[in-house]
Every structure is written in C-alpha cells, then in structure tokens.
UniProtKB/Swiss-Prot annotation:
Low complexity biased stretches: 156-166
Gene it is expressed from: Sgf11-1
Protein name from the UniProt record: SAGA-associated factor 11 homolog 1
Alphabetized InterPro entries for the sequence: SAGA_su_Sgf11, SGF11
Region entry Disordered, spans: 1-36, 156-209
Compositional bias ranges of the Basic residues kind: 193-209
GO biological process assignments: chromatin organization; mRNA export from nucleus; positive regulation of DNA-templated transcription; protein transport; regulation of transcription by RNA polymerase II
Species per Swiss-Prot/TrEMBL record: Drosophila willistoni (Fruit fly)
S-S bonds: none
Length: 209
C-alpha cells in the first residue's frame, strides 16, 4: 500500500490540497531492507519536478517551515537564557568608549607631547640635574665611572701617602728628640763620674804620701 502525503501551503488556503504518492515499505524492492536507495530518491525527485506548479508550492512551503522553525528555536533559546540569567554573561559587559582628544600639543589619549626638560635631584650633591645628564653626573659624582674611579684611586693613594709620611715624620721627630735628651742627660753623668774618680785617685795619693 502507498502512503499519501498532503502538502499544505498557507498562501493557497481553501484550494485543493496537493497530494504526492510515496510508495509504502511493502512496495519497496527486495534487498532494500526498509531504507530508500539512491535510485528511489532520484526517481521521486524527478516525479516532483515534472509538474512545475507543485514543485514551486512544495519549495515555498518547505522554505517557510524551515524559517519558522529556526525563528521559534531562537526565540525559545533567548527566553530560556533570559530566565536563567545567562543572557548577560553571554553578551558580556559593554566596554567604555574612550573619546579621542583634539587638544593641541596632545595625543589622542590627552597626554601632552610638548618637550619638557625634566630634572632630577642628585642624592649625593643634592643638585638639580637634567634627566638626560643624570646618569653620567651620578656616575662621576659617586666615583663609579672609569675615569672617576682612577681619580678616586689616585686620591686614596695620595691621602694614604700623606698620612703615612705625617705619622712617620712624627715618629722620627720623637726619636730624634728622645736621642737628644738622652745624650744631654748622659754627658754630664760621665763627666761627674770621671771627676769623682779623678778626685778619689788624688785623695788616695795624698793619703799615701
């Protein structure tokens, strides 16, 4: 037995309904196992396109049905997202639009593009130095550069030599003064001893006489 499919067109309401005869499962050829073969699909397609009026109506109905189903599905999904609160998370937050700046001597973000000589304070000498010259000034001021390190080393050697000579000269002066004092103290002692010895010898001779 064959089944009859009725194709309804909303535009042609009240008119005769178009009917297309589709073979039933019993009428299928043996070996098809209930599934349509490519030849059957092609034959049905050829049967439909023989009558251009029926073909146009079927295509229009199919197109309208697909559009309605897609629209209804979108509406239902949007309604469900709105109920569950997932619509806001899906859309995301609206980013703030930054207006472009048209002021003179400024970029589009409003930052000034005018050249300014920035100055920095030296932590060693507390002088205001231009930012361009701050690094070499700090290098020379702290004695960290090549030339400045040599100068600092030279200063250290000179200061160490001067300190050593000053301490050595003081010790030499102290030694010389000590020697002079000792020589002065020792000379009268020798003379007194000699005089005492001479006197004692003379006294002994006089006594012997």
């Amino acid at each position: 037995m064959s089944r009859t499919i009725v194709v309804k067109n909303p535009r042609t309401s009240g008119k005769d309904e178009d009917k297309a005869q589709i073979p039933s499962q019993d009428e299928l050829p043996s070996g098809s196992s209930g599934a349509k073969t490519t030849n059957q699909i092609i034959s049905e397609f050829r049967a439909l396109i023989k009558d251009p009026i029926k073909l146009d109506e079927a295509v229009n109905y199919l197109y309208e049905t697909l559009v309605d189903d897609a629209a209804v599905g979108i509406f239902i999904e949007t309604r469900q997202l709105q109920k569950t609160g997932s619509l806001t998370a899906l859309e995301g937050t609206v980013e703030e639009t930054n207006d472009m700046c048209d002021l003179p001597d400024c970029d589009i973000f409003g930052m000034s593009t005018a050249e300014k000589t920035a100055k920095c304070c030296c932590p060693n000498c507390e002088r205001m130095v231009a930012a361009v010259r701050f690094a070499p000034h700090l290098q020379t001021c702290l004695g960290l550069g090549r030339s400045s390190s040599r100068a600092a080393l030279r200063r250290l050697t000179v200061s160490s030599r001067s300190s050593s000579t000053s301490t050595g000269g003081g010790q030499a002066n102290e030694k010389s003064t000590d020697d002079e004092d000792w020589s002065l103290d020792s000379r009268p002692g020798k003379s007194t001893k000699n005089s005492r010895n001479k006197g004692s010898k003379k006294n002994q001779k006089n006594k012997l006489k």
